[in-house]
Amino acid sequence: MSKTIAINAGSSSLKWQLYQMPEEEVLAQGIIERIGLKDSISTVKYDGKKEEQILDIHDHTEAVKILLNDLIHFGIIAAYDEITGVGHRVVAGGELFKESVVVNDKVLEQIEELSVLAPLHNPGAAAGIRAFRDILPDITSVCVFDTSFHTSMAKHTYLYPIPQKYYTDYKVRKYGAHGTSHKYVAQEAAKMLGRPLEELKLITAHIGNGVSITANYHGKSVDTSMGFTPLAGPMMGTRSGDIDPAIIPYLIEQDPELKDAADVVNMLNKKSGLSGVSGISSDMRDIEAGLQEDNPDAVLAYNIFIDRIKKCIGQYFAVLNGADALVFTAGMGENAPLMRQDVIGGLTWFGMDIDPEKNVFGYRGEISTPESKVKVLVISTDEELCIARDVERLKNTK
């Protein structure tokens, strides 16, 4: 009985999913939140049940111990040795990791060094990897990188128009993110359309709290909206997305609360986007409630959000010289029909038309009309399954 855990560890959280492999059956899933803070929360879902505990969890090692003990306590596994592999989501792999890899000491050290590219994500991932290696040293640990899928971009696409020494000396370039999600939904889109992925031109829109759009040509990423860090691209839940970089020194000069570039970047990452403009929330459901109340700040935030996403999708029609399908995925992409309606409403010139009933009530699958030249699909992303598959593929190669 081979079981694999897919892990997404953040700075203060550890999200997990346990699979029976190779059957790809989900046995249990959960999340541990507020790691390092008082009143940490551990949630376990299995067999239609939900168990929640309030604990004091001081670090990721303690979180992993609690997770594993819960698996035994709730009868999900009988012993640790049933787990044969662990897969870790890592946001930034830089140019070092073009595909998923089995973890060793050198890989872990490189992931920590790459934290400069994803300071909000890589340190937590490294902590999760260390914790599992300490507690389950004999099982295979695999890293799956958000950036790997985008290493197929051409040099003229991933380089910024600044002196090349900043790339050669400091590796400043576009890396992208959400690659595992974009790869998965492109594969699923090909199945849904009944055509080989190698023949398709797709635009995949991962729209959650983080937002990224990718141009997929014959199964390869040829451009993506996130850049050197996941801050780039369209407006997001709490992130600004693209802004004029000259704003950064200007704000440091003008606002005494912003003392340096790090303060401004923190504001752009955590206090901007839907949340910053609306003053309400980063959650689209709260923004839509504000629309119903004619809240002017909610209306403004929503309009900027739609405008930025439409522009990004439009430019990828140019990159691909047309597209066979547009795919919506992730939290908002899958669950916000009003957002999808308003995005498509500004792209009808490209030959897209959605069925209003399918858009609102269909939830998953094709929501475009039969006459639509470009198919519009809603596909649930499953990054955890992608991670588990890579563990299964690599666990006998270490």
UniProtKB/Swiss-Prot annotation:
GO terms for biological process: acetate metabolic process; acetyl-CoA biosynthetic process. Transmembrane segments: none annotated. Signal peptide: none annotated. PROSITE patterns: ACETATE_KINASE_1, ACETATE_KINASE_2. Pfam families: Acetate_kinase (PF00871). CDD domains: ASKHA_NBD_AcK_PK (cd24010). Pathway: Metabolic intermediate biosynthesis; acetyl-CoA biosynthesis; acetyl-CoA from acetate: step 1/2. InterPro entries: Ac/propionate_kinase, Aliphatic_acid_kin_short-chain, Aliphatic_acid_kinase_CS, ATPase_NBD. It is found in: Cytoplasm. It comes from the Bacteria. Keywords: ATP-binding, Cytoplasm, Kinase, Magnesium, Metal-binding, Nucleotide-binding, Transferase. Substrate binds at residue 89. Mg(2+) binds at residues 8, 383. Its EC number is 2.7.2.1. ATP binds at residues 15, 206-210, 283-285, 331-335. The active site is at 146 (proton donor/acceptor). Mg(2+). Can also accept Mn(2+). GO terms for cellular component: cytoplasm. The record marks 178, 239 as: Transition state stabilizer. Belongs to the acetokinase family. Catalyzes the formation of acetyl phosphate from acetate and ATP. Can also catalyze the reverse reaction. PANTHER family: ACETATE KINASE, ACETATE KINASE-RELATED. Homodimer. This is Acetate kinase. It comes from Streptococcus pyogenes serotype M28 (strain MGAS6180).
